[in-house]
Amino acid sequence: MSEALNELASYIREARGALVAGSEVRYGELTLTTKAESLIALLTFLRDDVQCGFVSFIDVCGVDYPQRPDRFDVVYHLLSPRQNQRIRVKVATGENEPVPSITSVYPGADWFEREAYDMYGILFTGHPDLRRILTDYGFEGYPLRKDFPLTGFVEVRYDNEAKRVVYEPVELKQEFRNFDFLSPWEGTEYVLPGDEKAKSR
């Protein structure tokens, strides 16, 4: 399988080398890296070229690397039923650097791009309706970013007296603690079967 993927990578580099910044075969899948300005041209080639035939769009997802200057990877997964192969295309982008929407190439990417915007704050230029799709109206922040607090910022509940949904600041019932369960000094005390017999001797 990896031999066929290496041949495909060589073919793509020969045909459209200027559009591909890097390629690697890992875990039985070919990954191409490209720049945002080359994305539409590369995906159009992968879809329309007879040797490639990646006509099935599977997914768009975001990956957050807060320590990098280009914080996000936008990752596209495609399938070629003709060749029975999958391919992954990655584009790195910063917090305020938009990526072109691929809805002109794969119309099914519409809601996936909206989800990446809603969860990570990744901007897509040329998207027909880029607005939140999973979070509530007026939601602040992007919940899948690694710097988003686990508790969130607001608590949503139904108020029986007001007969409506209310938003309140998060109120923790106890102080937030970070346990290191692997540490013999901080972990919880475990009572194992038979421990009580050993203490009575």
Swiss-Prot record:
Q: Which topology term describes how it sits in the membrane?
A: Peripheral membrane protein
Q: Which reaction does it catalyse?
A: a quinone + NADH + 5 H(+)(in) = a quinol + NAD(+) + 4 H(+)(out)
- Subcellular localization(s) per the UniProt record: Cell inner membrane
List the molecular function annotations (GO) for this entry.
NADH dehydrogenase (ubiquinone) activity; NADH:ubiquinone reductase (non-electrogenic) activity; quinone binding
Q: Which GO terms describe its cellular component?
A: plasma membrane
Tell me which UniProt keywords the record has, alphabetically.
Cell inner membrane, Cell membrane, Membrane, NAD, Quinone, Translocase, Transport, Ubiquinone
Q: Which InterPro entries match?
A: NADH_DH_suC (IPR010218), NADH_quin_OxRdtase_su_C/D-like (IPR037232), NADH_UbQ_OxRdtase_30kDa_su (IPR001268), NADH_UbQ_OxRdtase_CS (IPR020396)
Whether Disulfide bond counts among this entry's keywords is no
Q: Which EC number(s) does UniProt give?
A: 7.1.1.-
The keyword Translocase belongs to this UniProt entry's keyword annotation: yes
Query: PROSITE patterns, per this entry?
Result: COMPLEX1_30K (PS00542)
Indicate the principal place this protein occupies in or around the cell. Answer: membrane
The annotated subunit structure for this chain is: NDH-1 is composed of 14 different subunits. Subunits NuoB, C, D, E, F, and G constitute the peripheral sector of the complex.
Family from the record: Belongs to the complex I 30 kDa subunit family.
Biological role stated in the UniProt entry: NDH-1 shuttles electrons from NADH, via FMN and iron-sulfur (Fe-S) centers, to quinones in the respiratory chain. The immediate electron acceptor for the enzyme in this species is believed to be ubiquinone. Couples the redox reaction to proton translocation (for every two electrons transferred, four hydrogen ions are translocated across the cytoplasmic membrane), and thus conserves the redox energy in a proton gradient.
Looking up PANTHER family in the UniProt record yields:
NADH DEHYDROGENASE [UBIQUINONE] IRON-SULFUR PROTEIN 3, MITOCHONDRIAL (PTHR10884:SF14), NADH DEHYDROGENASE UBIQUINONE IRON-SULFUR PROTEIN 3 (PTHR10884)
NCBIfam families for the chain: NuoC_fam, PRK06074.1-1, PRK06074.1-5
What is the name listed in the Swiss-Prot or TrEMBL entry for this protein? NADH-quinone oxidoreductase subunit C
Give the gene symbol: nuoC
